[in-house]
Structure formats: C-alpha cells, structure tokens
Amino acid sequence: MKWKVLVIAAVLKAHFPVTEAHIFGLLDPKLCYLLDGILFLYGVIVTALYLRAKFSRGEDVPVSPQGHTQLYNELNIGRREEYDVLDKRRGRDPEMGGKQRRKNPQEGLYNALQKDKMAEAYSEIGMKGENQRRRGKGHDGLYQGLSAATKDTYDALHMQTLPPR
C-alpha cells in the first residue's frame, strides 16, 4: 500500500513540475497603490476640515471686558484653592450633608520637621492629626499611613497571629 502511494506521488511529480504560488498578500503592488490612494484622500479631507475650522468666521463667542468668556470668568476668582468648587454655594461640604465647613487656621497639610527624628535613617514626615491618640487596641505601629476610617475598620476586625512554622 505504501509503495502504491509512493509510486503515484513520483509519477505525478514527474509529469507536473512544482512551481511556487505567488501570493503577495499585503505586499501586492496593486493593494499598496489602493491603500496609498485611500490614505491620500483621508489626508486631503482632514486638511480641508482643519483649514475650514481655522479660517472660517463663525459665530463669535461674546467676550466680557476681561477678555475671557463668562464661563472662564467664574473660574478666575482671584484666589487659588487646591480643589475649587464650581457650585455657587461655596464652602458647603457634600460629605457633611451640605453643612458649612469651618477651617482651622492652624490646619495645614504637613507637620514640620523634628530634629530628634532626623537621626533615624528612614524617618518620614507624618500628616497632622496622625499623632493624636486614637481609641483602639493600641497597635498604632501597625497602622502607619492608614486613614482614620481604615484604622477603625482594622480595629474592628479581630486579627489572629499566625502560628510559627
């Protein structure tokens, strides 16, 4: 049986010469010319739209005396806050139910450097309020860098120590 298949394959190979099929795929010159034409048309259309938008005299936006539109004048109020509220009712904290929030004058973002802690190689500057005494189990060393809400969550969980291996 194997000899039959082998003989038939040899006869077919002798009568029909082996030629490679020329399949260009994406390297076919006709396809490249077609894609170049599409890319050229796309470039012309985008350039025309850009020039039309740049040089057209459409409706002018009303300009205030300061030279900016009214939308931007509301934002340029002369003072700079980290997170400025766009709401007209400034100072109301949505997390407190819209109640007025009072700022402490000494409420800053960071504590000052302390000379005695600078002796440690890996000391860090803590946030104000971190050194306050908290209610809990007294594991403040475990909870460094966590917010008060996260610390309370960890205090509420009963953490068991793992047995030694």
UniProtKB/Swiss-Prot annotation:
TM annotation in the entry: 31-51
Domain annotation ITAM: ranges: 61-89, 99-127, 132-160
Cellular localisation: Cell membrane
Basic and acidic residues bias locations: 86-98
GO cellular component, one term: alpha-beta T cell receptor complex
Record comment regarding domains: The ITAM domains mediate interaction with SHB.
Protein name per its UniProtKB record: T-cell surface glycoprotein CD3 zeta chain
